Amino acid sequence: MAFNKNLVIKVCGMRDEENIHAVEQLDVDWMGFVFYPESPRYMAQPLGFKNFPFDVKRVGVFVNEQKDIVRKTSLKNLIQVIQLHGSELPSYCRVLQLDGFEVMKAFSIDSERRFPVKKVRLYEKCCDYFLFDTRTSGYGGSGRKFDWDVLSDYRG
């Protein structure tokens, strides 16, 4: 995994075309589309991407989904980065990489400042990006922050 110190701005939970074009005006780098049926931001129907801003990377968010469904959904929606929030194994991530997708694996950080360094290291060769998020009872982002100092010793 290459370490990139550049800031990337991603807005996630995009569902309707009007909202997508409004966010595009903010000059974001990435837009996220949630394909997890339990999420309130679930995108059940694929968008028509003919008017989509193609200079923005499209991220598909999945949780413990079958690889074939991830592939088909991603291809249908022109997804470039697959973001995984479940218990997907490194081998699962590697298969998606070999299929030509960039892979982002999400890891939960708990309030006790414990960083899952051993677990993260298992994914270094099969993921292009990591997303560190505050632990919640469910999957996905909560909007709550954690103590970023917990990441200071990690050199991935």
Predicted segment positions?
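Conserved N-terminal beta1-alpha1 strand-loop-helix module at the mouth
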Residues: 1-156
